[in-house]
């Protein structure tokens, strides 16, 4: 990545697009604090995460960031409800089981709560992953190709779930995708090519137009990024 600079207002939905190898997943990893930039800074929720140590970064991610992986990353020895409850239990939530059940109901999996990942279809596993990502009510949700392993019908259902939960929880949603339909449903699209930010467009931008026109204070921005490069080269999406 080279000289990537942008701000994301709170509650905005953003798609990161571009060909394989353009740096999309690397950018998302930097935003999540999973990678470190070689120069520049990244602020999430007004906090510079590039200055954080690993233990503090882990706590910050647990409290502030939800992450959805293309390959689900469910714990195979835990049931659906147990997978969703894990981040809640780690954060000390007393109602972990109840909250997990509510989220699985919200994604249409009330009858599959006690099933293990191997007993679930790909679409069902991704819905469990979506529920888990929203479990701790994170102000920031990052998703790496959330529909990449799903057929078009199931992928469309997952998109609807993401947007519905986004509206209900007022979460800022940033996702990497090759799916043109998914990208067009976002309020803003960042396009990368060869590690550079090629374009920053707002095809369906409405809610945040006034913020962009008048400017916003740092507390109104959930993400601010100004980086020259990352610790590793831009990688192809798998």
Predicted segments with their positions:
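ABC family nucleotide-binding domain
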Residues: 1-185, 189-192
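Conserved beta-strand-loop-alpha-helix hinge in the C-terminal portion
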Residues: 196-221, 235-237
